[in-house]
């Protein structure tokens, strides 16, 4: 999600080069929930769950864009961005094997929690582990939010793209966005690990075999470990497009192929479009 906070731009004196500046707030969410986990919550049948994850981040970006033609058929543009990290959270389990008890359910969990933010505080509490040793565990159900703005990291990125008209009325384009990183600082870091059997209260299966299973965030016992700084790449997007126009450029047929890279997977989209613009001030797209 991109929320534009400020933006302005203008052509240079030759009316061919264009520059712009914008300020945006960016957020993204990436998930990976295996089918086996949903099957367990529906039926209560034990399942071996692997690679379960949820991540999100939020940052502000200030970008400067400049674009210009090269010859009569080629047009290029680039955008340089300064990034301010606001918040980042990632929880990932390489193992989350689930089973059902009489009034509770269990998860043999091996995973990790990473949080970078000055807008969020997760308290810890000393509890005895399975070996009887007391350790600090994050209390996820007692998270506190602080509206005070304080950056948790800084970074940089760039976008680059070009269009080319190989023959009259045919325009092809290519672009790559969000090639860059954010370096999250140690002072804003919270880091935890889990490698134990977790117990969640509230589970039953009715006569028809449908499970009613409760999930309590406070039962996720991540042991506090040493905080550390982290540098993470952004989720890039690649666009490849083509459009052909007919009837004095009033009708256009286009195709766009997109690749969105997330933490756990890459999403591929192919979109076709038809555009009709009989006059300059009116147009239809589908």
What is the predicted function of each stretch?
Residues 28-34:
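Hydrophobic alpha-helical transmembrane segments of integral membrane proteins
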Residues 1-27:
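N-terminal, post-signal peptide beta-strand-biased segments of exported outer-membrane/organellar beta-barrel
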Residues 37-286:
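Outer-membrane beta-barrel porins/channels
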């Amino acid at each position: 999600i991109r929320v534009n906070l400020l933006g302005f731009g203008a052509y240079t004196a030759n009316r061919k080069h264009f520059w712009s500046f914008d300020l945006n707030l960016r957020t993204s969410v990436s998930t990976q929930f295996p089918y086996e986990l949903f099957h367990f919550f529906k039926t209560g049948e034990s399942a071996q769950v692997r690679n379960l994850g949820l991540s999100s981040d939020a940052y502000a970006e200030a970008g400067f864009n400049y674009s210009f033609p090269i010859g009569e058929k080629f047009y290029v543009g680039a955008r340089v961005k300064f990034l301010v990290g606001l918040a980042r959270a990632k929880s990932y389990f390489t193992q989350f094997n689930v089973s059902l008890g009489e009034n509770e359910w269990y998860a043999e969990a091996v995973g990790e929690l990473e949080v970078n933010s000055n807008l969020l505080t997760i308290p810890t509490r000393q509890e005895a582990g399975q070996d009887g040793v007391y350790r600090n565990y994050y209390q996820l159900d007692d998270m506190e939010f602080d509206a005070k703005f304080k950056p948790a990291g800084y970074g940089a990125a760039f976008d680059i793209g070009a269009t080319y008209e190989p023959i009259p009325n045919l325009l092809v384009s290519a672009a790559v966005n969000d090639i860059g990183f954010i370096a999250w600082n140690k002072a804003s870091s919270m880091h935890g690990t889990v490698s134990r059997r977790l117990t969640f209260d509230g589970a039953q299966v009715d006569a028809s075999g449908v499970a009613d299973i409760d999930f309590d965030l406070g039962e996720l016992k991540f042991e506090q470990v040493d905080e550390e700084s982290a540098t993470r790449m952004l989720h890039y997007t690649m666009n490849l497009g083509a459009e052909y126009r007919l009837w004095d450029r009033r009708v256009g047929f286009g195709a766009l192929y997109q690749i969105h890279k997330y933490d756990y997977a890459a999403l591929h989209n192919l979109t076709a479009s038809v555009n009709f613009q009989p006059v300059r001030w009116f147009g239809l797209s589908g």
